[in-house]
Amino acid sequence: MKVNEESVAEFVKNLQMTQQKVETQLGKALAKSCATIQREIQESMRDTEIDISKSYYKHNKNIPHHPSMPYNPPAVDTGTLRRSITYTVDEKELVGYVGSVINDPPYGLYLEKAEYGSSRMKPRPWLKPATEKSLETIKELLKGAVKAGIK
């Protein structure tokens, strides 16, 4: 094969097109990955083990709070936290974020304490375990994206 300026230019053009295809596929896979984590978080909250012995009524209302057992995701009372779990994806930068859009005090502070615990509360992690549980699916999605992009 003879190498000349025209063949090098065509090779570079093909490489750039392949890169663009791979990045497009990765962006789609990233969105699916974030949706997978979101779904796992929401399901883990729905299925969490609760501690009936420590139930109480919140804020002088007739809404019972049944706390989750330590080292389990937060329990669902009203569904506000579970509904607030969302994700955003920047397909151009290939970055995704998954988490709660609630950051109003005191709820935002509680979410951090729930994940890591505090001096008065054992951890009730929900972000990290859901992400770890989703890792194999995410790896497969990303692998598939790269393969689809280079076809």
Residue map of PLM features:
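Short, Lys/Arg-rich flexible segments
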Residues: 1-151
